[in-house]
Amino acid sequence: MVLIRVLANLLILQLSYAQKSSELVIGGDECNINEHRFLAIVHTDISLCTGTLINQEWVLTAAHCDRGDILVLLGVHRLKDVQTRVAKEKFICPNRKKDNEKDKDIMLIRLDSPVNNSTHIAPLSLPSNPPSVGSVCRIMGWGAITSPNVTFPGVPHCADINIFDYEVCRAAKPELPATSRTLCAGILEGGKGSCDGDSGGPLICNGEIQGIVSWGGDICAQPREPGHYTKVFDYTDWIQSIIAGNTDVTCPP
C-alpha cells in the first residue's frame, strides 16, 4: 500500500511539475533495465528528485531536494524488484549559503536500513579522478520525454551529453563567478539535457558518478545553454568523512 501511494503521488508531482516547466531528460531513450541499478527516486510530499546509491546505506543527491521527510525507492523499472527506505539522516554542507540553492548543491542521505544488492539494485562508484573536457557522459531520470506537450514514459530515460569547459557556461550566463565547483555539460546545439525534475540525479562518466544534476536554464536543453552539475570529485573527502562518522567535517569553500 505504501508503494502504491508513493507512485500515485509521483504521478501527481510529475503532472504538477510539467505545468510549470520542462522538468525532464530531453532527447533520451528508455534506459536499459540493467544500466541504472544505482538510480533512486527521492520523494517527499512536495517534491520529486533523483538520487544515486553509492553503497548499501547511503544515497547521494542535491541539497535543494531537502524539502521534508524523504522516502527513497530503489530498483524501480516497471515496478520490478523495488526496495523502499526512509531517510534516517540527511547531511548538507554546514558552510553552504542558506540563501543560495546553487551553492554546494550536494546532500548525503543515510537510509534507515541497508539495501540488498539484487538484479536491479547495486551502488555506483565515486570518482577516482575528475572528468576531462570533451568526455561523453550519461544522464538519466523518470521525467517527461516531450515538451511542452508532455509525455511520461513510466520508465527512466537516458541520454549522452558532453563535458564542456566552464567558460562555455559562463558565456551563456556572464554573471556566474570566475570559478565554480560545478561541471558544465550538455549538447551545444541543444535537444538533450536534464532539468529540474531530474534534480539530484547522476552525471556518469566512465562508470563513476562525476556530477549531480543541479540547475539549468528556464527552458531545458536549449542551444548553447548547458546544464550545471555539482562536481562530485571536489566533495569526495567530505562524503567519505561523513560515511566514516565524522559528521562535523565541512565542505571545500
UniProtKB/Swiss-Prot annotation:
Residues 1-18 form the signal peptide. Residues 19-24 form a propeptide. Its main location: secreted. CDD domains: Tryp_SPc. It comes from the Eukaryota. One of its GO terms (cellular component) is secretory granule. GO terms for molecular function: serine-type endopeptidase activity; toxin activity. Glycans are attached at residues 116-117, 149. Keywords: Disulfide bond, Glycoprotein, Hemostasis impairing toxin, Hydrolase, Protease, Secreted, Serine protease, Signal, Toxin, Zymogen. Snake venom serine protease that may act in the hemostasis system of the prey. Belongs to the peptidase S1 family. Snake venom subfamily. GO terms for biological process: proteolysis. This is Snake venom serine proteinase 14. Its EC number is 3.4.21.-. Monomer. It comes from Crotalus adamanteus. The lineage of its organism: Eukaryota, Metazoa, Chordata, Craniata, Vertebrata. The keyword Protease applies. Expressed by the venom gland.
